Amino acid sequence: MNSEASHLKLPPLKLGKLTVETPVVLAPMAGVTNKAFRRLCREYGGGLYVTEMVTARALVERKPESMRIIEHDADEQIRSIQIYGVDAVNVGKAIRLVVEEDRADHIDLNFGCPAPKVTKRGGGAALPWKTDLFTAIVHTAVKEASRNDIPLTIKMRKGIDDDHITFLESAKIARD
């Protein structure tokens, strides 16, 4: 194998005002992407590391475990937090807290969690099926994040299952 074939050159990833030089994003994983794991991944040169999923309501209530989850090391160049919520009010309040306290440079919303304990409550991958609620959450999140020009992304799946495909409609809503 020649040296050109062993090194793939990809353009940086642009997220609003942010530039991720190495366009590799570590997906948020509950119980995995804690500070220590993100630090280990940074040492090996990835680009963007998102915290474990934290619920909007727990942030609003300032639950100690949730506040710990959104802590970042001083050398994390892009502080990225993933928020999960099932109502626009708490998602908005959680993002406002993150913005006002300067706790993140990037926010990701979780509409992709397939865990039954999440989807049976109408959250995660099940939420985009409820287009009015999905729209309200996304619009509220964008409004709050834009108060400090913080880029917002959405993690989602193709749908709840093969009979409930939501990604196209959800992507259009998020884009608009």
List PLM regions with ranges.
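Short, solvent-exposed beta-strand edge segments and adjacent coil->beta transition regions
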Residues: 21-23, 76-80, 153
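Glycine-rich, positively charged N-terminal anion/phosphate-binding segment
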Residues: 4-14, 29-105
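Short, structurally constrained coil/turn elements
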Residues: 20, 75, 146-148
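Non-catalytic, substrate/partner-engaging modules appended to enzymatic cores
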Residues: 20-21, 39
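Alpha/beta enzyme core
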Residues: 43, 92-123, 127-176
